[in-house]
């Protein structure tokens, strides 16, 4: 019998293959709380090991040699994927743009900070066709420099060098992005089940861009921002302009930056649609092993050079697509445009008439001239009144355009890196930028013991001290490294007025802590954290444990002038399960909102559990609510939350929306009240396993120490100077 006709063998393992397609736990119980987002990026998946320190490795990187190699790459055309016009500048700019452009300010997720473009789903998005080829072109450089340069940094740098080679004076560059080693599980890209599903499903009303579902910042599944062919693929530049304004705002960009990035992104390179997308192989994740992680290979033709298919739109935007100039605006405003279609059938705009010398040359044969094109997004810059005014200003002042673009590009590629203190390398700009959330250096020379003594004599309760410190620190987002206690922005607009910060209580507490800061030379940021630490120490002492909470001085105080109030609006907590509070009813359950906050804070599931139990018995609930305070000794850091939760002497009865009573099984008498967040600690099998550990008689001190460790982790989450 021929080998190819042998019957399939039975699985050699009785229970079946471990990679079989049987239902997962989450498929069997889709409504169960999925803690996977707290378990992702485990150090076991990192091949570099726990001892590897990327920032130390960066110190040995020959930056100038790396940049020289990247510059050489830009014109080193490869036969397997030849460069357009002999230059990869357009391609590399696109690889970088499509990595950084996935960032959204709403939750800080996406962006270029992790090298996530290497993994699903981004590596296989329809909008990312052939970015896989760009990364393969970069591989020899990554191979050469090894651990000294992360994929995330290399991808971000490649586009920056591309613009430099094209002739732009770039604004600068910072290293410091660390790679992840598996797809991110915490990022919500939408609930559609098909690529490029109509936009309607993610809008309340697709004609009103502001109704785009939060936290999304792209109009369709698999796109970076807008559909280049128009809303739902139907050309309408004005409607596209409205979607651009909203999606770019959700990336943290204003109108001027939007125009600059759109035009600058299309000043170099071209779009590819000279063929049929039906001839392309599957995307990288779906392709067979023989493709070795490459996707979209043309199976019925050359599929390279002038015959490449990417977006389906075909053509260049400018007369000289490898050169940084004002050619985009010249082309856009010099001609009248008509709607047409590419060879791949995509909608695009073509000039009604154009002089031969204005046409770009063919990517392979300079003796052939081709027709330039504009997308619906490009036409939006001409027809939208606000975009048009900005575009004309750029058209008439190339130096201004170049400066705005260079700054916007820097912002695009660095927005998710956090504060400037995380930047590494010789090309870090000296200028402080408002979107970097600058914070002055704080003092470390004051008398910490004297500050604690004043806090102890202040008359503030343990609950006041702990709640204020928690509220100050909980804004931290590990996604884009924003927020946190450093800077003490909780005392500034908009944070001082956020409902979740209990403005009246906050004002009262700050009126006591701020004079202490002035009198001692400490920053108010340090005093807020130190006060919270003191409160935790007192709670531990009340439980019988004399444990010092670690404290590192040096936080600074940001000013109102250093704070872009509007940009902090997305950091406002709409719920905080740690303080047992939700602003209003949401489609998402309170326990899922808790999970999201824990993930942004960088917490593990055990840390989430220990913090919930500790904050409840300390009495740190929003508004002093009694829900979940399962103790007769509030203010003491006891294990009572867990012992009560696991005690079968009690039953649990729903009493209203998100509310429950804990009743004595024998008498039926109500003992405590609780919320869904409280009860999920005992109902979820994983969280209950942790709760049982802390309910054990021999783990009372362990609980106190674990709580203090998790508390300190949150207080120091934004102390990048301590890393």
Swiss-Prot record:
Coiled coil: none
BP-aspect Gene Ontology terms: cellular response to hydrogen peroxide; hydrogen peroxide catabolic process
Pfam families named among the record's database cross-references: peroxidase (PF00141)
Record PROSITE patterns: PEROXIDASE_2 (PS00436), PEROXIDASE_4 (PS50873)
Keywords for this protein: Heme, Hydrogen peroxide, Iron, Metal-binding, Oxidoreductase, Peroxidase
Cross-link (Tryptophyl-tyrosyl-methioninium (Trp-Tyr) (with M-251)): 97-225
Catalytic residues (UniProt): 98
Amino-acid positions noted as binding heme b in the UniProt annotation, renumbered to this chain: 266
Post-translational modification: Formation of the three residue Trp-Tyr-Met cross-link is important for the catalase, but not the peroxidase activity of the enzyme.
Membrane-spanning ranges: none
Domain of life: Bacteria
Covalent crosslink: Tryptophyl-tyrosyl-methioninium (Tyr-Met) (with W-97): 225-251
Complex formation: Homodimer or homotetramer.
Protein name from the UniProt record: Catalase-peroxidase
Taxonomic source organism: Agrobacterium fabrum (strain C58 / ATCC 33970)
Lineage: Bacteria, Pseudomonadati, Pseudomonadota, Alphaproteobacteria, Hyphomicrobiales
GN (gene name): katG
């Amino acid at each position: 019998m021929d080998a190819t006709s042998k019957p399939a063998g039975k699985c050699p393992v009785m229970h079946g293959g471990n990679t079989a397609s049987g239902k997962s736990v989450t498929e069997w119980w889709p409504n169960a709380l999925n803690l996977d987002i707290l378990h992702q990026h485990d150090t076991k998946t990192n091949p570099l090991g726990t001892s590897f320190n990327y920032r130390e490795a960066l110190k040995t990187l020959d930056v100038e040699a790396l940049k020289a190699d990247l510059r050489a790459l830009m014109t080193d055309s490869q036969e397997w994927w030849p460069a357009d016009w002999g230059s990869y500048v357009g391609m590399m700019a696109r690889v970088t743009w499509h990595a950084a452009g996935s960032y959204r300010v709403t939750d800080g997720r996406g962006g270029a900070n992790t090298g996530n473009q290497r993994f699903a789903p981004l590596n296989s998005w329809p909008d990312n066709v052939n970015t896989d080829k760009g990364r393969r072109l970069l591989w020899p450089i990554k191979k050469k420099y090894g651990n000294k340069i992360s994929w995330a940094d290399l991808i971000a740098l490649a586009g920056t060098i591309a613009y430099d080679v094209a002739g732009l004076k770039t604004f600068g560059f910072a290293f410091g992005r660390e790679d992840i080693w598996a797809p991110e599980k915490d990022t919500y890209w939408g609930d559609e089940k098909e690529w490029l599903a109509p936009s309607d499903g993610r809008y309340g009303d697709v004609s009103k861009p502001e109704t785009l579902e939060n936290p999304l910042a792209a109009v369709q599944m698999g796109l970076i921002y807008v559909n280049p062919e128009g809303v739902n693929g139907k050309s309408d530049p004005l409607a596209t302009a409205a979607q651009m304004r909203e999606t770019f705002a959700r990336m943290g960009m204003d109108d001027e930056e939007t125009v600059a990035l759109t035009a600058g992104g299309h000043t170099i390179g071209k779009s590819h649609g000279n063929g049929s997308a039906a001839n392309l192989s599957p995307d990288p994740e779906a392709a067979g092993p023989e493709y070795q992680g490459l996707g979209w290979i043309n199976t019925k033709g050359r599929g390279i050079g002038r015959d490449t298919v990417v977006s389906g739109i075909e053509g260049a935007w400018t007369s000289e697509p490898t050169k940084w100039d004002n050619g985009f605006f010249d082309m856009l405003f010099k001609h009248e445009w008509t709607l047409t279609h590419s060879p791949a059938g995509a909608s695009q705009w073509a000039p009604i008439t154009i002089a031969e010398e204005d046409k770009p040359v063919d990517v392979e044969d300079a003796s052939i001239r081709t027709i330039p094109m504009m997308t619906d997004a490009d036409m939006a810059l001409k027809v939208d009144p606000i975009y048009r005014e900005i575009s004309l200003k750029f058209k008439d002042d190339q130096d201004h355009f170049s400066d705005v673009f260079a700054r916007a590009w820097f912002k695009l590629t660095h927005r998710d890196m956090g504060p400037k203190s995380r930047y590494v390398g010789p090309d870090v700009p000296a200028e402080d930028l408002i979107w970097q959330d600058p914070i002055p250096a704080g003092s470390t020379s004051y008398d910490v013991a004297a500050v604690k003594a004043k806090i102890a004599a202040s008359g503030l309760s343990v609950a006041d001290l702990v709640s204020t410190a928690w509220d100050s620190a909980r804004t931290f987002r590990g996604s884009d490294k924003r927020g946190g206690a450093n800077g003490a922005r909780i005392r500034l607009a908009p944070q001082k007025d956020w409902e979740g910060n209990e403005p009246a209580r906050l004002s009262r507490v700050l009126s006591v802590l701020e004079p202490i800061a002035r009198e001692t030379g400490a920053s108010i940021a340090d005093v807020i954290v130190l006060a919270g630490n003191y409160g935790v120490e007192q709670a531990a002492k009340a439980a019988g444990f004399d444990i010092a909470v670690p404290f590192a001085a040096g936080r600074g105080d940001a000013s109102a002038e250093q704070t872009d109030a509007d940009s902090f609006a997305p950091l406002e907590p709409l719920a905080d399960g740690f303080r047992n509070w939700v602003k209003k009813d949401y489609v998402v359950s309170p326990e899922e909102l808790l999970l999201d906050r824990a993930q942004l804070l960088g917490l593990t599931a055990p840390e989430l559990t220990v913090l919930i139990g500790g904050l409840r018995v300390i009495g740190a609930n929003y508004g002093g609510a009694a829900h979940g305070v399962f103790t007769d000794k509030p203010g003491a850091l006891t294990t009572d939350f867990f012992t009560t939760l696991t005690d079968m002497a009690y039953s649990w009865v729903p009493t209203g929306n998100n509310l429950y009573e804990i009743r004595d099984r024998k008498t039926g008498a109500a003992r405590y009240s609780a919320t869904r967040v409280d009860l999920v600690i005992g109902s979820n099998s994983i969280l209950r396993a942790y709760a049982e550990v802390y309910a054990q008689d021999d783990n009372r001190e362990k609980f106190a120490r674990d709580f203090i460790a998790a508390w300190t982790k949150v207080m120091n989450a934004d102390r990048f100077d301590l890393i």
